[in-house]
Design a protein with these regions (language model features):
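Unchanged
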Residues: 48-71, 75-135, 162-171
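A short, flexible beta-alpha/helix-coil linker loop
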Residues: 38-40, 120
């Protein structure tokens, strides 16, 4: 075995992505899902596919596991731990969910619940997710309540500068 092919040079990290999905309203709610294989309650998340962009993967996982369309808002953070003797890195994004479901939930999920932040933290089975949601949850809910920001449109390269409405054009 050459150094280039030895196990020490192979990235054995499991890369996963997910979201803290928030439904806005008078009382915002956070999605938690129950897996069928072990009945554990977790934040919606899953493995990143080969060559998949992490944001697309996170959106896909949340839609598959909750059945709700979501808008990805911002990156929130990372949880890292050992899973089956391999390092696992889970990246989370804040997502705004629509009011009603649009899709069927995947068969690996037996239940989806939209809970208050305190109830979601209490329901989670994974201690690392509990700590993560405790630390970032209030921020996520406040950010999810904000109205969407319009993206600034940049002028084309070489275009003249935009005139302000109060400037007069001289002939």
């Amino acid at each position: 075995m050459t150094p280039e092919t030895s196990d020490s040079f192979v990235d054995r990290t499991i890369h996963a992505v997910g979201g803290i999905a928030v439904r806005k309203g008078a009382r915002p709610r956070v999605a938690v899902v129950q897996r069928s294989k072990d009945k554990l309650w977790v934040l919606p998340r899953g493995r990143l596919r080969r060559d998949e962009h992490p944001v697309r993967g996170a959106r896909r996982e949340v839609v598959e596991e909750t059945g709700f369309r979501v808008e990805v808002c911002e990156f929130l953070g990372v949880i890292t731990y050992q899973a089956r003797s391999r390092p696992k890195v889970v990246r989370f994004w804040l997502m705004r969910a629509e009011a009603e479901p649009s899709y069927r939930v995947m068969k690996d999920i037996v239940a989806v619940e939209w809970l208050s932040l305190a109830a979601a933290i209490e329901r989670l089975s994974n201690p690392l997710e509990k700590v993560f949601l405790t630390n970032i949850g209030r921020h996520a809910i406040l950010r999810a309540k904000r109205p969407k920001r319009r993206k600034a449109i940049m002028p084309a390269e070489g275009a003249p500068p935009r005139r302000r409405s109060h400037q007069r054009m001289h002939s």
